[in-house]
C-alpha cells in the first residue's frame, strides 16, 4: 500500500475512511519504466520509485513544460500528477488535475479509476460510482478493483440494491474483509439480516484483527442490532490471534465477553479461559494477576494444567530463573507424560542444559528426547543440538555419530546442510585436513552460510577455493517475448509500471516451469517489480541459479532495487550496500509495502517505535507508521541504524543478530559465547529465529559482494571482535 504523507483535506469518516486507506493502491501507479516512457525524466522516475515527497512537484513541473511545448506525454504526466495528489490526500486538487487531459484508450480505465477515487474521498458517491463503472470493462486486474469500488460507492450513496451484485462479484474475485463488511452492510440495508449476520460472523472469525472486523464489532456493540453469536471456541480462537499479535488488552476484552455472554459453563472451559488470561496478564506485566489465573488453569483437566505449568516455566526462563524453570519442566515431564506439554518440557530440559554448558547432560537428555517422542517434529533439532553439545565438549566421535544419524534418519530435514558441514568441521578439529570435503560443501550449498564457511575453512587450510559463480548476474537480453505478456508490456510502455506489475503478478499462478519463470521474472524485473520477480525465482529457479549457475536466474534471486539510493545511503553510513541488500532480502523480500504480524513495515521492516527513536537521533520529526512504506524514508532510517550497529558490533554476524534480536541481547550473547569461532557462536545463539536470520543475512551479504562488488572478495572473519562498550542501545 502506498502511504499518504497527510490526510485528505476532505477526510472521509467511518467506513469510508477505512476504504480511503484500502483504496490507495493506485497512489503511485503511473511511473515510467525505462526508455519506454519518454515524457518523464530519469530524475522523476527515481523520485517516484522512492516515493519522495518532491515527486509531485517534479511531476507538475515536467507537466507544465510538456504542456507548454505541446509534447505527446502530457496525458501520462497529468495522470501521474493527479495520482500523486490523490496519494498526498488532496482529492479535490487531484480531480481538477485528472480532468484536464483525456487519456489514450489504454490509459482511460486507469484515469477513470483515479477520478472515482477522488470523487469518493470528497463524498460525491454517485459520481464516484459512475467513474468506477467506466473502468469495469477494462481488460485485466483493474476491472475487479473497479467493480469493488463501484459497489462500495453505490452503497455509500444509499443504493444498496445496485451495490450488492457488484460487491458480490468483487468478493468472488478478490475476497477480503472490506468486501465482506460491505456485503453485510448491503444485505442489512435490504432487510436480509440473516445474510448480514452470516457475513459479520465470517468477518469476525476469519479476520479478527482487520479494521473492518474491529469497526463492525464496535458498531454492533453501540447499536440496537443483535450481536454476532460466536461460540466459545471461536472466542478463544480470536483471543489467541490477538495474543500472538501482541494485543493483550484486546485479548482480555475478548475473554471478558466470553464470560459475560455465558459461554464459560464448565470447569474445563474456565481453565482454558484462565490459561489465556494468564498469558495476557504476563504480556501486560501484571504478574500477580497472571499467577492467580494460572492457579485456576492448573486445577483444570490434565492437558490445560500441563500447559499452565509450561507457561509458568517459560515465565521463569524469561526472568533468568533457570533452576526454578527446570524444576517445573521436570515436574511436567513426570506428572503429565503423554500430554503435548510434556514433549516441549523434555526438549527444553536438554536445550537448557546445553545453554548452561552442561554438555554431557544435554547430549543425554536430547538423545532421550528422540527416543521418548518418536513422532515429534523436533527430533532433527534435538539430534543436531546433541551433536553440538558433543562438539563443544570435544567428543569428536560422538559428535560425528549424532551428525551421521541426523543425515540418515532425517534426510529430508533442512538441517542436513549444517550436519554435513559440521561432520567435515569435526574431521578437521580431530586433526584431519578435509580439503575435498569442504570443496564438496561449497559446491553443494554455494548460496548458504555453510558454503561461505567452507570457503573460509579452505583458505584457513592453505587452499584456494574454486570459484563457484563465474559470471556476474544480469538480466537476460535473449528472453523471448510471450503472448501472455502483451498487456503488461503495453502498460509498461505507456508508463504504468505498477499496473504492469499487477498484471504480471496476476499471471504468476500460471507459471509452472523454469523457462516460463525466467521469461515472466525478467519482465517483472524490467518494470521494477523486484519482489514479485524474486518470489517467482525463489519458487522455480533454484536449479538454474545454483546448479546451472545461470546469471539471469541469479539476477532475479539477488536483485538490487533502488540501487543508486541504496549505494549512496550505504556510503553515507559507512556500511556495505551488500549488507543492506542482504537485510532487505531477508526482511521483506524487496516488498516495499510489506506489513508483518508484529506491525513492522516496509523494505527493512522497521517497527514504528524504532523508527521514532532513529528520527529523534537524527533530529527529525517521528514518521507516521504508514510513512515507513516509503522506500526512501525506510532505507534512510534503517541504513543509519545498521551503520550504528556496525560501529558497535563490527562483525556482520553480530550486526545481523543485533538487527533481529536487539543490541542488548546480542551483547549478552557475546559476553557468554563470544570466545567461540563464528560458526559455533551462531549455532549456539539461543533464539531459533535469530540463528536462521544471521545465517541467511551473512551468506547473502557476501554473495552480493561477490556478485556486484570489486575484484577482491571480502573475507569473513572466523573470530568475533569484542563489541564497543558504548554505542546504540535500542
Regions found by a protein language model. Give the residues of each.
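N-terminal leader/linker segments that initiate helical-solenoid repeat arrays
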Residues: 36-83, 87, 96, 110, ...
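Short solvent-exposed coil/turn linkers within tandem alpha-helical repeat scaffolds
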Residues: 65-74, 98-109, 132-145, 169-179, ...
